Amino acid sequence: MAEFLDSEAEESEEEEELDVNERKRLKKLKAAVSDSSEEEEDDEERLREELKDLIDDNPIEEDDGSGYDSDGVGSGKKRKKHEDDDLDDRLEDDDYDLIEENLGVKVERRKRFKRLRRIHDNESDGEEQHVDEGLVREQIAEQLFDENDESIGHRSERSHREADDYDDVDTESDADDFIVDDNGRPIAEKKKKRRPIFTDASLQEGQDIFGVDFDYDDFSKYEEDDYEDDSEGDEYDEDLGVGDDTRVKKKKALKKKVVKKTIFDIYEPSELKRGHFTDMDNEIRKTDIPERMQLREVPVTPVPEGSDELDLEAEWIYKYAFCKHTVSEQEKPESREKMRKPPTTVNKIKQTLEFIRNQQLEVPFIAFYRKEYVKPELNIDDLWKVYYYDGIWCQLNERKRKLKVLFEKMRQFQLDTLCADTDQPVPDDVRLILDSDFERLADVQSMEELKDVHMYFLLNYSHELPRMQAEQRRKAIQERREAKARRQAAAAENGDDAAEAIVVPEPEDDDDPELIDYQLKQASNSSPYAVFRKAGICGFAKHFGLTPEQYAENLRDNYQRNEITQESIGPTELAKQYLSPRFMTTDEVIHAAKYVVARQLAQEPLLRKTMREVYFDRARINIRPTKNGMVLIDENSPVYSMKYVAKKPVSDLFGDQFIKLMMAEEEKLLEITFLEEFEGNACANGTPGDYVEESKALYQLDQFAKHVQEWNKLRAECVQLALQKWVIPDLIKELRSTLHEEAQQFVLRSCTGKLYKWLKVAPYKPQLPPDFGYEEWSTLRGIRVLGLAYDPDHSVAAFCAVTTVEGDISDYLRLPNILKRKNSYNLEEKAQKLADLRKLSDFIKMKKPHIVVIGAESRDAQNIQADIKEILHELETSEQFPPIEVEIIDNELAKIYANSKKGESDFKEYPPLLKQAASLARKMQDPLVEYSQLCDADDEILCLRYHPLQERVPREQLLEQLSLQFINRTSEVGLDINLMVQNSRTINLLQYICGLGPRKGQALLKLLKQSNQRLENRTQLVTVCHLGPRVFINCSGFIKIDTSSLGDSTEAYVEVLDGSRVHPETYEWARKMAIDAMEYDDEETNPAGALEEILESPERLKDLDLDAFAVELERQGFGSKSITLYDIRNELSCLYKDYRTPYTKPSAEELFDMLTKETPDSFYVGKCVTAMVTGFTYRRPQGDQLDSANPVRLDSNESWQCPFCHKDDFPELSEVWNHFDANACPGQPSGVRVRLENGLPGFIHIKNLSDRQVRNPEERVRVSQMIHVRIIKIDIDRFSVECSSRTADLKDVNNEWRPRRDNYYDYVTEEQDNRKVSDAKARALKRKIYARRVIAHPSFFNKSYAEVVAMLAEADQGEVALRPSSKSKDHLTATWKVADDIFQHIDVREEGKENDFSLGRSLWIGTEEFEDLDEIIARHIMPMALAARELIQYKYYKPNMVTGDENERDVMEKLLREEKANDPKKIHYFFTASRAMPGKFLLSYLPKTKVRHEYVTVMPEGYRFRGQIFDTVNSLLRWFKEHWLDPTATPASASASNLTPLHLMRPPPTISSSSQTSLGPQAPYSVTGSVTGGTPRSGISSAVGGGGSSAYSITQSITGYGTSGSSAPGAGVSSSHYGSSSTPSFGAINTPYTPSGQTPFMTPYTPHASQTPRYGHNVPSPSSQSSSSQRHHYGSSSGTGSTPRYHDMGGGGGGGVGGGGGSNAYSMQPHHQQRAKENLDWQLANDAWARRRPQQHQSHQSYHAQQQHHHSQQQPHMGMSMNMGITMSLGRGTGGGGGGGYGSTPVNDYSTGGGHNRGMSSKASVRSTPRTNASPHSMNLGDATPLYDEN
């Protein structure tokens, strides 16, 4: 068992060697012992003994035959025990007495740790106790190290052998050797130090507890038994007793076994998987097969000897991997021709498969050491392709084998069934399985064909499968019974004792055949084909003349290979023979027969294979933009060139085009249609026809008899039905998938190609002068690199770092002013820059780097490069420095590394820029090693940018393909194993060594660190690292050992070839070559000496005749080794020569892309971009031009104009000449300077500035102006562009700049669509727009339908906005938000209008009259909004997420069925807001199997459901749950019964405003509805409208209705219970609305109030609060005629409401039944409310107190807090001073302006106090009783 801690309880001075964490753990253990044994507190020696009992892992080998084996922690670990480990510390005193009596020796009794025992006691009692991490770890240690002998099995010999390798050379003191046990063995043996191995904290914790090599099998035994004896020591082996006098110990009562904690209980599964600690990982490590072969999706399996599978597979791979063309064009023709493989490739593929499958050799090994068998046809990429296709072949073969077994079982079942009754004929619906079916299955070559065969099998035999399985089950049971009877009979012959001794466990199968049939009974197949087959229609189908197989052969060969067998009677006459109760007429029989024949044709594998080949070759697509696509797809879109495409062959798609099209389709920008019509075969005249029509002709009989023509017609219909309904739609799905996969493969190849270019670069090698011999500049051991990283922000300091030759950071420098300018006019800035340059110069002089690299962050890198070059030039002169290059390199890798977990762990204290600098320097030292830093468990290598579409390919595939590049490159370069152990930078490359992987590499590294020794030769990979033979053969050639560094440090034989690419299997040949080259005699043979000499003079190898040597080797049976011998010669010439491409400077284009962060795809000539004008350029006049200058006199103002700069304010001619002489003339304007968005400077020549002639560019543009330009030239050397802003160029009139259109571009359709769009715009302009109104109300907007909907989209639920109606001038529309994206539009009719622009004196919704807009909102819309919110907050409400063409009922039905599946006992129901009918809620419920849908309509009176009105959700649900079984009418869609159309509205009754108002439940009103993006209903048109004020928020309390007289009831004013706020905004929270003193419907048309208030002008945020003194005023101070702005509603004057006195208020939500009985006007309503008020107030006083306390805490929380019991004052206060308005609203909730404290809620109206979900009260809102028992 591995050690628990590094220390084995040494003295305190020994503990100093432990790290901090280990010291803490040791202290915990000491404290535990101290607590449990206070009497021995001062006895340190006793403490050491106790600690040894717990954590000492010193191994002891025991020879008593108890047989410890390797079921312990690791495969090579011995059982490590203390001298008394064999005694369980849980033994009681009497147990010790018994053991001592039997053993005859005195046993030392250990004390038990009380704290650890307390854990056991608590757990055994079943109590859940919180145990800290330390206690858990100690408990696990106790469980692991205190197990008895019986819990451990036998160890293998290999475990004993491996255990020795793990022990270190350090031993304890010599005195320990004299302490022996009874058998004379030393107690203390070797021990070793252990260092933390895992960087991850959780994995290190696991190592601390279990040791490095713990085995998960050890922990499985802890979970085997549920019960055990309380003491394991109670039972003991009889062999330990003395003689036969053994006593039997009574067993203690069994009790629940303590649940042992394993590693799986402590660590998360994701952590175990990340660290490769699962059982599967352990198995992979142990198996002697390359790790990647084990991890392949289809593991590599050997081929049986004598099988021809490899020949078949090689042919298959050659055909499908190297010859078969892709459907789309993935390679250019020249590349495709270059990649074509000759037929000789088949043998090379077969040999490769032999290596892979039978010899388990990985691809890199084959590519490097079996070249003779694969070259020249197959390179390493081809070998990986063979490896990949081998997986597909194995998977295909396995599936074919399973299907073949199914075929054989079915054929045997058919044989048994027919043999049971040989007299009966074969039924018509039975198709016998023939040998041809097995042949067809054997000929399957692809997964698609296999799927076809499988579907054909299911079509014909699926109905027989249950019976076949039942018969097989019956046979198996019968065989078991017979076998049992035979055993019993045989046992009876041998006697009863033998019979009793035979115990055979019986399977838990029920032998009852009836039960078997019941268990196998499946759901009846109710498909049309199954119904028709049962009705006997399959017999009729056999009379159509050809079997499906025969017709498929005709179709394949494209001629009538099989003649049609024609019936002598017509189909109608024949159909009469098949009439049945199911099919009463011949038409029904014929219709069924057509379906059966068509279905059989569609499932015929040969037909589908033929159709697939033809369709994939000839398929075409149409592409059309959607409405959004027509607008959003511009010339910068990747699919612009294919915006309109007609009949484009899919074979013409190139590269990743289809992924781009799919992305546009997913974004609803394009519609891709695969045409079902495609070309047939060419006719005699050369013009192909339609393929489907040609297919019909192959099923026709060329005769003219009537009944023949009838049969021909039926056959043609069958063919058309089969192809167009089933075959072609299926092929379209396959084709889409194939095109997508091919485009993904293109992206993968692009990604790997990019990584290949990055990894193929060799470490930088400076070119020092030949005569430069200074030792400090030597590059033999490597180079020093200075890396510099900066941020374009000048306020961020730059950093540079210098690496040593090993890659460590030796020093760094902070440069805060390196980006500043040396020639700056700011003297301080200049001095700072020079100081940084001096520091950098001193730094370079001290560190002497071989090269300086700068991160390509921006163009500032070029300035830094110039500064450093100047420094280095000075150092060359003054310090005799060699020429040092300064390079600018890509910094993408450095930036990702700086933010990666690896970078964080490597440099925890470094800032990101310093990490970047270190990564830049290391990248120059070795790009492969630096890129491998991102190859960790988090797969950060995927963060690099390889391709714009890399996110569109599966992550696993991309990671696998990138790994192949690392494998190839690591195999080419090799890995120094000893250097890797010393320097962790190369650790990540170990997993890419051939034969290894993350798991095997991790184990190898662990062993090397444990042994703490260097590998001296490759043989130690087997002897020390325990690699198996297969893995060793694969990896040994790629692991190099620097033999020169070993020197004299080892006595072992040093093999110089271990430092070369020569594989150990060819060492003898290399030695032979060296001996022959040195011309040694056989007697004088010294291979080692010969090799050393040949390495010093490798030119002597050129004299060898390697071809003759190869022939001799082949003659001796070693195979062809010609290429290998030449490789050995090259390797001996230069050991492990680096074949990577030397570093080269970036080209001008590469540097341009790096510094601008652009690519040729993102920045190109012709692109339209935006630019900012930075200045103007002029061409100064030269001497001759000045002499011939001719100033112009302007007649308009009698002034003179300069002929060059066109300045025209010179009063005298002499001043023009003075203008020239003073050199003040800038010259003639030549162009405009601009700066692009990416920072590049640009220039617009004056001729390209405009289509018209421009003489002065300053008249056209100004500095800092943003303009659109088109790039017409890119100068990559000067990092500048030339642009044009001419209208003709921007519109690209001549089609010379925009991306080239596709060859199949549909210009005709594009023109038609553009014409439709322009016509629609013209019609929209001509359409009559709504009349703008002059209505002073914060919720009124002069906006169109679309504008209002867009405005309300972000508003809270229940927000309302009123707007002009497009119906007529005497109509308004009230739009309120029902739910997200669902809006209801209510038509409001006006009467008594003074003019077209004013508000009517009376407003009507249906037959109900309202006085003003406030009353509509407060009495009609707000109650509905509150009712809707109560439903939305109900727990069984589901948001309406329906999009596109989905049906909301279907969505709810799917949701209900999912819930029903989870809990079938309940009747589930849900509400959702209806999009089809806004204002209604869909109630869907699932009683049994059919989902029912009904509508609940929100009304001002409550909820209308099944013609009844309910005031609360509770009452609605209570009634619904009692009457849900009552018959209901089917809910109609949007119709007149639900929505009253505007043109069918009943005329209003002629009643005055003071007459009674109908509040009945059926009061009609006109309602329309819409959702976002929809079209206004009932004539509501979208038109361009003006501004507006503010939407009315239902979260605002209505404090009064403004009237113009004091005769209105309730003239006093009441205040809401909200806190004060004077800054309301749209959707404001908890802010009451106070209307202005101006009555809305009496608004005169006055000049000072003619402007409609604008919404959104200086609107404060909802969260802003202000005091009562913060008020704003608009208009006159008195308030009359003033129009308040949205943020000025608290304004002063008499316009405010909320002055003194009134106390009458009206409850928003009185019970609808009471209101219906009381015919009251507004005054009577006030009185009635006052009468009801005391009854309600008393019963709800405590409730309001609770609510007041709750809302005082919750009020600022959410946007829909609405903590209000709504109270309305009916008084219209026109007088009163500045006491009104928001500022004076009292903060105290539930207090009115008159000082009356009144409750706002009643039992009859729960909605009057809405709560948010954050409130605890909302948890109980609504009836929580389910339709059925929820439990």
Curated annotation (Swiss-Prot):
Residues modified as Phosphothreonine are T171
One Gene Ontology cellular component annotation held by this UniProt entry: histone locus body
Domain (S1 motif): residue spans on this chain: 1217-1286
User: Cross-referenced InterPro entries, in alphabetical order?
Assistant: HHH_9, NA-bd_OB-fold, RNaseH-like_sf, RuvA_2-like, S1_domain, SH2_dom_sf, Spt6_acidic_N_dom, Spt6_death-like
UniProt biased composition (Low complexity): 1531-1542, 1602-1627, 1660-1683, 1736-1746
Q: Which spans does this entry mark as compositional bias, Acidic residues?
A: 1-19, 56-66, 85-99, 164-180, 223-240
Q: What are the alphabetically sorted keywords of the record?
A: Chaperone, Coiled coil, Nucleus, Phosphoprotein, Transcription
* One function term, GO molecular function aspect: histone binding
Q: Mark the residues carrying the PTM Phosphoserine.
A: S34, S36, S37, S66, S70, S75, S124, S151, S156, S159, S173, S1661, S1664, S1815
Biased composition, Basic and acidic residues: where in the chain?
A: 45-55, 119-140, 151-163, 470-482
Residue ranges occupied by any SH2 domain in the UniProt entry = 1329-1440
Q: Which Pfam families match?
A: HHH_7, HHH_9, HTH_44, S1, SH2_2, SPT6_acidic, Tex_central_region, YqgF
| Gly residues bias (residue ranges) | 1689-1703, 1772-1783
Coiled-coil segments on the chain, per record: 7-59, 467-494
Q: Which Gene3D superfamilies match?
A: Nucleic acid-binding proteins, RuvA domain 2-like, SH2 domain, Spt6, Death-like domain, Spt6, helix-hairpin-helix domain, Tex N-terminal region-like, YqgF/RNase H-like domain
Residue ranges with Polar residues bias: 1565-1575, 1631-1641, 1799-1818
Q: Does the keyword Chaperone apply?
A: yes
This molecule's function is given as: Histone H3-H4 chaperone that plays a role in maintenance of chromatin structure during RNA polymerase II transcription elongation. Required for the transcriptional induction of heat shock response genes and for maximal recruitment of two other elongation factors, Spt5 and Paf1, to the induced Hsp70. Plays a critical role in normal fly development throughout the lifecycle.
UniProt family annotation:
Belongs to the SPT6 family.
Q: How does it assemble?
A: Self associates. Interacts with RNA polymerase II. Interacts with the FACT complex, which is composed of dre4/Spt16 and Ssrp/Ssrp1. Interacts with the exosome, a complex with 3'-5' exoribonuclease activity which is composed of at least Csl4, Dis3, Mtr3, Rrp4, Rrp6, Rrp40, Rrp42, Rrp46 and Ski6. Interacts with the DRB sensitivity-inducing factor complex (the DSIF complex), which is composed of Spt4 and Spt5.
- Which protein are we looking at? Transcription elongation factor SPT6
Organism lineage reads as: Eukaryota, Metazoa, Ecdysozoa, Arthropoda, Hexapoda
